[in-house]
Amino acid sequence: MKKRSVSGCNITILAVVFSHLSAGNSPCGNQANVLCISRLEFVQYQS
C-alpha cells in the first residue's frame, strides 16, 4: 500500500512535468508538485 502511494505520487509528478512542457509553468502545477514531494517525504518518514 505504501509503494502504491509512492507510485501514484511519481505518476503525479510526471503528469505535472508533462503539463509544464505542453502548457508552460503554472502555479497550480507547481503546487501539486510540492504537495506530492511533501507526501513522499511523509511516507518515507513513517517507514
From Swiss-Prot:
Q: What triggers expression?
A: By CD40 stimulation in dendritic cells (at protein level).
Cellular component aspect of the GO annotation: extracellular region
Task: Report where it is expressed, by tissue.
Answer: Expressed in Peyer patches, spleen, thymus, liver and mesenteric lymph node. Expressed at high levels by dendritic cells, and at lower levels by T-cells, monocytes and B-cells.
UniProt subcellular location: Secreted
Q: Which UniProt keywords apply?
A: Secreted, Signal
Q: What cystine linkages occur within this chain?
A: none
Concerning InterPro entries, the annotation shows: IGIP (IPR038815)
Q: Report the leader peptide range.
A: 1-24
Q: Which PANTHER family match?
A: IGA-INDUCING PROTEIN HOMOLOG
Q: What is the purpose of this protein?
A: Enhances IgA secretion from B-cells stimulated via CD40.
- Put simply, this protein is called IgA-inducing protein
Q: Which organism is it from?
A: Bos taurus (Bovine)
The coding gene here is IGIP
